[in-house]
Regions:
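Short, well-structured alpha-helical segments that form the helix of a local strand-helix-strand
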Residues: 62-66, 151-162, 234-236, 301-318, ...
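Internal maturation/activation junctions in enzymes
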Residues: 293-391, 404, 411, 512, ...
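Noncatalytic scaffold domains of N-terminal-nucleophile
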Residues: 22-47, 51, 59-221, 226-228, ...
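Short, small/polar residue-rich loop motifs at catalytic or cofactor-binding pockets
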Residues: 258, 369-372, 394, 434-436
């Protein structure tokens, strides 16, 4: 199915594919189109969005179709039971908006009682579930900017849920990885995703009639089709039975937020990304400011010397962002202080002052592995949706309320539980932080690049390396995305060793050089597997008015345009 869809996209629609990037660990095949582009985490979702664009829908209409189809085709990564952070660039006004539809803790949460629960209950089962935000976020986007009837935008996801999505080989990897969770005890999730009690084979079509019914109610009644009525009642009943804390009132009163992005000036460009409670942008934007004047010896970025430079900076900005950026009114001010000239000069001096082993350890904190997906939609008017959506970890809390077909998030696990003074400490109605970082780059006021990536703590480091490779070292995006992916694991306890992680395509000489500089080097994954280092999705805006989509094959990503 995936091969067929890509063939139809490239051949039947008359698109051009740029040449392959040579001698790279991962080959990224750019797809260029003139009228519209969708890049998404599954080819059937990308195609759903493309069809909406070609039928006359705008970027928001196609984004709704793409988002909901992703929830069908990547049930381990995102969906109605999870969260959404959406950047929208409106070309007519040249303004960028953000819809924060992040999951929220229950409004009536008894914090002292919840904190005393076993840690496992913060991460699995109904007790781990926050109020989902995705449907409310899409509804808000449609109400402000959609051009077609809401029901028409939802219809492609309904059709996909009825017909079944194709389990691709890399999709099956995630099913296999989460087999224990799928078999753990929730009968509904096992029924849906372990047909006949077995992991689905690649090529299997997996329908979800219950989810199709939920989507039909959403199409008919708008946000109330999910947050009120029979779906909400089913969720609330399952929560009560399963020890959850989310009530029908919590669902009915949830609201997405319309807000503004955070951003920096960088070498004449303007880079905008996700605001608090997301903290990933604070990390890579601050790092970019520290490194703004660095030439990296004209490359390559992945030399031991340059990687050590990046790691020293990351060692400083990551703990700041975890400490200061959360769902708190003061976090925007903290971000502005992080990127203020005096702060950047101090960070630059500190990063170069000491061997990495002598740098002070940050305050203890934690960062979870996550299940996330990213998509980008650009329409013929130049409007852009750049959005990341997530269940927190793969298959979320591992539960599906009977009759709904909806996998619920485990976002309660993203809160801080040990320090009541921490900005991310669990609280009623608070939205837990996340590293998700949909990003748009502007040059002379015009968009030149939109990108995003799933991957939890690796989201901001991956975004940083792609931007540095492309914007500073001038590498084509296909090369920046296809080269060896890496990440810095910063210890949270004094005495722990700084760890540099990379795909196994990292040259041995550079690994040895990093070890000599004090880094522990771990190469956990072959290049292109995408389980840890995930896949970047991007759209480039070309001078001739065409759009080039980049779908990282580390995952099941696909680009579709016309």
């Amino acid at each position: 199915m995936r091969t067929l869809i890509r063939f139809l996209i490239l051949i039947a629609l008359g698109l051009s594919a740029a040449g392959r990037a040579q001698s790279l660990p991962v080959t990224v095949m750019p797809v260029t189109a003139r009228h519209g582009m969708v890049v998404a985490g599954h080819p059937q979702a990308a195609e759903a969005g493309r069809q909406v664009l070609q039928a006359g829908g705008n970027a928001i209409d196609a984004a709704i179709a793409t988002s909901l189809a992703l929830g069908v085709a990547e049930p381990y990564a995102s969906g109605l039971g999870g969260k959404l952070m959406l950047l929208y660039y409106e070309s007519a006004t040249r303004r960028t908006y953000v819809i924060d539809a992040m999951d929220a803790a229950a409004g009536s949460l008894d914090v002292p009682a919840y904190v005393k629960r076993p840690a496992e209950q913060h991460a699995y089962g109904y007790g781990a579930v926050c109020v989902p935000g995705l449907a409310a976020g899409l509804w808000m986007a449609h109400g402000r900017w959609g051009s077609r009837p809401w029901a028409e935008d939802v219809q492609p996801a309904i059709a996909l849920a009825l017909a079944g999505f194709e389990v691709l080989p890399k999709s099956r990897d995630f099913f296999e990885e989460q087999a224990k969770k799928l078999r753990r005890g929730d009968a509904e999730i096992a029924r849906l995703y372990l047909p006949q009690g077995r992991l689905p084979d690649a090529g299997t079509l997996l329908p979800n009639p219950d989810l199709a019914h939920t989507l039909t109610l959403l199409a008919q009644k708008g946000r109330d089709g999910f947050y009120r009525g029979p779906v909400a009642a089913a969720i609330a009943a399952a929560m009560k039975k399963g020890g959850g804390v989310v009530t029908a009132d919590d669902l009915a009163t949830y609201e997405a937020r319309l807000t503004d992005p955070v951003g920096i000036a960088f070498r004449g460009d303007r880079i905008m990304s996700a605001p608090p409670p997301a903290n990933g942008a604070a990390m890579f934007l601050a790092a970019l400011k520290v490194l703004e004047d660095d030439s990296f010896d004209a490359g390559p970025l992945r030399s031991a010397r340059n990687l050590d430079r990046l790691g020293r900076v990351w060692r400083l900005v990551e703990p700041q962002a975890y400490r200061l950026i959360a769902d708190a009114p003061e976090s925007r001010g903290y971000f502005e202080k992080m990127i203020a000239p005096d702060s950047i000069r101090a960070l630059r001096a500190q990063a170069g002052a000491l061997p990495v082993a002598m740098m002070q350890a940050p305050s203890p904190d934690q960062s979870a592995l996550a299940a996330t997906t990213h998509f980008i939609v650009v329409d013929g008017h130049g409007n852009i949706v750049c959005a990341t959506q997530s269940l927190s970890v793969h298959f979320g809390a591992g539960v599906v309320p009977p009759g709904t077909g909806v996998v619920l998030n485990d976002s309660m696990s993203n809160f801080e539980f040990s320090d009541p003074k921490h900005l991310n400490y669990v609280a009623a109605g608070r939205r837990p932080r996340s590293t998700i970082s949909p990003t748009i780059v502007f040059r002379q006021g015009q968009p030149v690049l939109a990108l995003g990536i799933p991957g939890a703590a690796r989201i901001p480091t991956s975004t940083l390396q792609v931007l540095l490779d492309h914007l500073v070292l001038g590498r084509p995006l296909a090369e920046a995305i296809g080269d060896t992916r890496f990440h810095f694991v910063i210890p949270w306890k004094p005495g722990e060793v700084e760890t540099f992680e990379a795909e196994q395509s990292l040259p041995a000489a550079q690994a040895a050089g990093l070890r000599a500089l004090g880094w522990k080097v771990v190469l956990p994954e072959a290049a292109g597997r995408g389980r840890l280092f995930s896949g970047v999705n991007a759209v480039e805006f070309n001078p001739d008015g065409t759009l080039t989509g980049y779908a990282d094959p580390r995952r099941t990503n696909a680009a579709a345009g016309y």
